UniProtKB/Swiss-Prot annotation:
The keyword Oxidoreductase does not apply. Keywords: Nucleus, Repeat, Ribosome biogenesis, rRNA processing, Transcription, Transcription regulation, WD repeat. It is found in: Nucleus, Nucleolus. Component of the proposed t-UTP subcomplex of the ribosomal small subunit (SSU) processome. SSU processome is composed of more than 70 proteins and the RNA chaperone small nucleolar RNA (snoRNA) U3. PANTHER family: WD REPEAT-CONTAINING PROTEIN 75. GO terms for cellular component: nucleolus; small-subunit processome. Residues 764-798 are annotated as: Disordered. It comes from the Eukaryota. It comes from Xenopus laevis. One of its GO terms (biological process) is rRNA processing. Its main location: nucleus. This is WD repeat-containing protein 75.
Amino acid sequence: MVSQCQIRVVRSGGSKLDYRRSVFSADGKYLICVSGDFIKVYSTSTEECIHALQGHRKLVTGIELNPKNHLQLYSCSLDGTIKLWDFTDGILIKTFLIGCKFLSLYTSATDDLVFAVTLKNNDSASSQLVSVKLPKSASQECEAKEISVIIEDVSHLPKCTAIGRQCLYVASVKGVHLSIYYFKTKKSFRFSLKATSKKGANNIFTVVACHPSEDCIATGHMDGRIRLWRNFNHKKEYTYTSLHWHHDSVMDLAFSAQGTKLLSGGVESVLVQWPYGSEEKKEFLPRLGAAIEHISVSPHGTLYCTSHTDNKISIIDTSLKVSGIIQGLLKGTVVKTGLIVDPRSNALVLNGKPGHLQFYSLLNDRHLYNLDIVQQEFIHQAGLQYMDLVKASFSSTGRWLATVEELQGGEDSMDLEMQMKLWEYQDKSQSFVLNTTINRPHEDHITSLCFRDEGNSEKEAPTLVTTGKDGLFKVWMLNNNYDIYKQSSSWLCDFVGGYHKNQATNCCFSEDGSLLAVSFDEIITVWESSTWDLKQTFCQPPGKIRNLCFGRMSCSKYLVASTNNGFICCWNLLTCALEWRAQLDATVLQPDPLSENIAVVSCSKRWSNLFLFQPSEPRPFYTQKNICQEKVQWAVFVPKEIPEFVKSESHQWLNKSQLYFLTEKQDLLTFSSKSTEERLTPLSKQLAVEESLPVTPFHLLLGKKRQEEQEKLDAQSVRAAPSFHRGYQNSAIREVLHTPAHVLPPASVLCTVFVNSLLISKKSQSTEESKEDEEMKSEHSEADSSDETEEMESQKRFPSAFSLDVAAMLPKFQEKELRRIRRTDYSWISSL
């Protein structure tokens, strides 16, 4: 029976960090950026995500600091709201309901006004600049109805509008026009440039920035020029100076906090710093990795940050040195490798920069590293062909990685330039090292590749199978006796197979690795992996095989396949008969490696639907429709580090693995049965006590040993001074030492409690000590006067300080034995 449960589709991260300009906190400790419908707060010193502010229902389009409170942040969204946040604690303070779609946001320090670019009548073709009066209300939600139009026709890009010094004017560019509006006088000025010139100039505006303390406006243009405008409060007496270094369009401009420097960036991946007033002495920060999309400056002027088209943010100090990098999930044009999981790190692996594989942590929503596969310099220029990564696969243990790279644009098989590389993971270097390079492994494009499960047997050589459009599948095995010294290994072709010269499209191994299934157009062939003999063929209904997989665990006797004409078929390998067939157009067929479950995603009427089933049963045990409004391209099950145990039967398929899927717009989504509060715990709650601070990698290495040593020292200190140790752990002392000073009561109030907590209680004596004291008292009472006289004489012969030291150093039982020895009569010795 299909279950209906509250499993929601949630964004797993990977949203664009370069969608809007980032914002520094007033002290420069935090960097705030837009990430889809989230707002993320990062630490500039550690690059760790401190908070993920969630409250908007749609894409966040603008963020700005509250000029009247530097600990608060304004944000706007396409959901028609403006929200006020306390970003240091991750708390939503207030929501202003406006009802129009916002594209960007600007704040004013003079009045309770914010400026925003909105769509005219929700029409995406035109936009306007408006001012919104934010009402003062005690309620958490309130409506803002006072909206005034300032400029009718503006660009929808936030970088094309800027607020002037002291909020005296606003400048906006669109096309070849520069518009300036003064708020107090309500006068507007409009300047125009010719679109082109005889020298080949392209004067279309791309960005505008205003000087923080002078009447100067900087504009960037398509031809790479920068113009500095002055005297723009006169229509005929205005002037501008031109700066030119960029060979392509200027993508962003920003003045420093004091206005002494102008920063510019473009597709050259170079940050240019122009000294204001002496622009010929410009400085450069090259090789930033990707085109610069946005530039931000901290309020105190000590930090810059650049947002790049590869979804990366670089934090830069004033000496033009990169001090930190925040890398998000890199989104390319097409994800050809699909979604892969690294068995070692449990990281998501897919196409990254051209010719690279990116490893991405799904747990922390953070980029780990890039693996350069092609190992060629990438030149950003239109029309150039370059080697592109098209296929990748890991072995079951993660020791081996196979990649296939092809020359971009090479469609003709005769001119095809292709390489397959085998990479081995080295424990010493903790990285993949190239082991074998195979030029042109097939005569045509490779369609799929997969490793055989290595299992626990070390005798079996690692095996890789590739299929190609040349109608062949090839078996590659690791040869450990490659050289005469038998000290190196390499991959060699061990077997070549085919079926009636049909194109080989898919391949997969059974769970135990004994069988190999290869699809040739509309036919599936099953081969024995020990001898590579053809054992069985299965014919599908008319339609080419799109996906192919074996069942796992209790369903390992089944083989499941989907076709491009809308069928899913399941065969029983024991009877070699069709077990069942269902009519469903499956774009994705993904098995769970830790269970018998198989996920199917189909697309109908622009909506994608999810079905989960087991091969032994044709009816799905879970269905969720309308998971997204786009076509799902790839999906993958990622094993959970800590399995969950949920009683609900409808949630049990999420116990061991998490299903992630990638849409056409490259949004990474997943399924969760937890609420938003459970998934996103504010870091302020996690850091409420000292023990819950996140550990560092250094602490993971040495923390256990130090913890054991500390426990030993604590045990010794408890035996030496139990009362003081208990006093230090007293809540009164902890309150004084750990409570922030600005919230503590006066010292006179805490003095009595604090001093009393340090006193040694008489009741702290143990029962054994009290018994020993009673025995000592009884022995003292039984001692005669002669013994007391001898003790007094012995005390006179030895200094009192020495006796105190001895008494203090001796334990109770030794002191008791010493007193008995002193009472012994040794007078008989004198008679000898």
